[in-house]
């Protein structure tokens, strides 16, 4: 069987849809997560579902149910393009190795500085983008953590949601 992610990505080519994830779950569920720059609409999910149903049938992909949805507000970030796209947004990262006894950091993602101008020793990550994360170490003490994608175990958007609404 061909790589399911690659097959799905190929099937969605030209649809202005970004494939975020393909996951097999219990009881034959095949979960496909998509995104668009201007947000995922229900019509996008319907269109992708119809397209993938046909492709998966032709390719003999075994599944009982197909679920197509958006990544939600806490969307995972997996590659450099996604990190660049969400620069300026609040994210949460988990480092592979603890830093000052801490692995999980939340803050504002900074885009990489051009040509290694960060002042970091670039020998370990030669040619790799060095991103920054502005976080509050202590109250009113903003620090910047520099990292490459190899330094992190996982990352996701971490928006601050206000459920109180406007007061009238």
Swiss-Prot record:
Keywords (A to Z) from UniProt: Cytoplasm, Ribosome biogenesis
Classification via InterPro entries: Ribosome_maturation_RimP, RimP_C, RimP_C_sf, RimP_N, RimP_N_sf
GO cellular component: cytosol
Keyword Cytoplasm belongs to the record: yes
Main location: cytoplasm
GO biological process, alphabetically ordered: ribosomal small subunit assembly; translation
Domain of life the protein comes from: Bacteria
Compartment list: Cytoplasm
One Pfam family matching this protein: DUF150_C
Family classification: Belongs to the RimP family.
Function: Required for maturation of 30S ribosomal subunits.
Protein name: Ribosome maturation factor RimP
Organism: Bordetella pertussis (strain Tohama I / ATCC BAA-589 / NCTC 13251)
């Amino acid at each position: 069987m061909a790589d399911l992610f690659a097959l799905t990505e190929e099937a969605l080519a030209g649809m202005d849809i970004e494939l975020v994830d393909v996951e097999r779950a219990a009881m034959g569920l095949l979960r496909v997560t998509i995104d668009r720059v201007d947000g995922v609409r229900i019509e996008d999910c319907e269109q992708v579902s119809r397209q993938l149903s046909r492709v998966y049938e032709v390719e003999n992909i075994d599944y009982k149910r197909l679920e197509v949805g958006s990544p939600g507000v806490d969307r995972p970030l997996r590659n450099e393009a996604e990190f660049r796209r969400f620069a300026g947004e609040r994210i949460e990262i988990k480092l592979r190795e603890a830093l000052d006894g801490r692995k999980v950091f939340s803050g504002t993602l900074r885009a990489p500085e051009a040509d290694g101008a960060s002042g970091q020793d670039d020998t370990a990550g030669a040619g790799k983008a060095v991103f920054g994360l502005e976080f509050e170490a202590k109250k009113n003490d903003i620090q910047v953590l520099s990292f490459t994608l190899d330094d992190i175990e996982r990352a996701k958007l971490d928006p601050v949601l206000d459920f109180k609404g406007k007061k009238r």
